[in-house]
């Protein structure tokens, strides 16, 4: 077949596809109006930098997993607060029935506007998620957690009954249905997950996440949250140092790490991560135990430097702008970013194996 004939056949096929499935169902990638990944800040400057694109990508699935009390829910609630600050709508599916309104409020979440569901079964929770995403009016959806999405058959059965693979099949079916809708509606879907240990594993990592393999494949970003150390004020424990590792990233290089202070009752310490990032870029100078900004000493010890920035908002804002510029994190608000409703990027699993 000659080159002209091949091109004519291709053009005819493209016209037929657009006629059958609508304009925008197929296009050359260079013809897309916007190729920039649209994002929303995670609420943590250090995590935004680790994600590589300045936050969570819109229209994608994100998995946050880790041990108990490591800070997974805190990370998710900060993202909810950021979406609400920009005037967006947030929904929270609390399958664990453990939402603390007081703590959420302390993190900046407007609980009056937060859509909350506490489903009875896994099927119900995922149906609610599908309905919310399909509406196109929800900017971020949090499912807390995948491990708590118990299939109806297990709820209605007897204790001790074997239900092999039920949850994995449920998640696989749900994600096949949800992934395309999430992409088209530009919803950020955050799935919080726990970890389990395989019995009898002698070599390698015995830790696995519940719900089968489907979520691993469909996720654009996977974050591993672990508690690194305890933060103390004298003998009092006032928080945890959390290590957030980007173990999978389809929109930027993976394996970057963000370390943040999660203070009890307050969430992620913005001044703590700001001090660390500013020191790394020599915006704040550290000599011995003393921290100084310009010609002024701002504290002896990291905690005192954090307190200084918290007490001097003008200095904090100035340092934050310099840090964002040094790390190349955009200052453009989300609403000012170019968007397109016709953008069609399929979220395909990495592998055909889903369970």
Swiss-Prot record:
Binding site for ATP: 66-73
Summary of the function given for this chain in its UniProt record: Can catalyze the hydrolysis of ATP in the presence of single-stranded DNA, the ATP-dependent uptake of single-stranded DNA by duplex DNA, and the ATP-dependent hybridization of homologous single-stranded DNAs. It interacts with LexA causing its activation and leading to its autocatalytic cleavage.
Any one GO molecular-function label of the UniProt entry: ATP binding
CDD domains with a match to the protein in the record: RecA
Compositional bias of kind Acidic residues: 332-344
Stretches for region Disordered: 331-355
SUPFAM superfamilies documented for this protein: P-loop containing nucleoside triphosphate hydrolases (SSF52540), RecA protein, C-terminal domain (SSF54752)
Biological processes, Gene Ontology terms: DNA recombination; DNA repair; SOS response
GO cellular component: cytosol
HAMAP family noted in UniProt: RecA
The protein's name in its UniProt record: Protein RecA
Similarity field: Belongs to the RecA family.
Domain of life: Bacteria
UniProt lineage: Bacteria, Bacillati, Bacillota, Bacilli, Lactobacillales
UniProt KW keywords: ATP-binding, Cytoplasm, DNA damage, DNA recombination, DNA repair, DNA-binding, Nucleotide-binding, SOS response
Localization: Cytoplasm
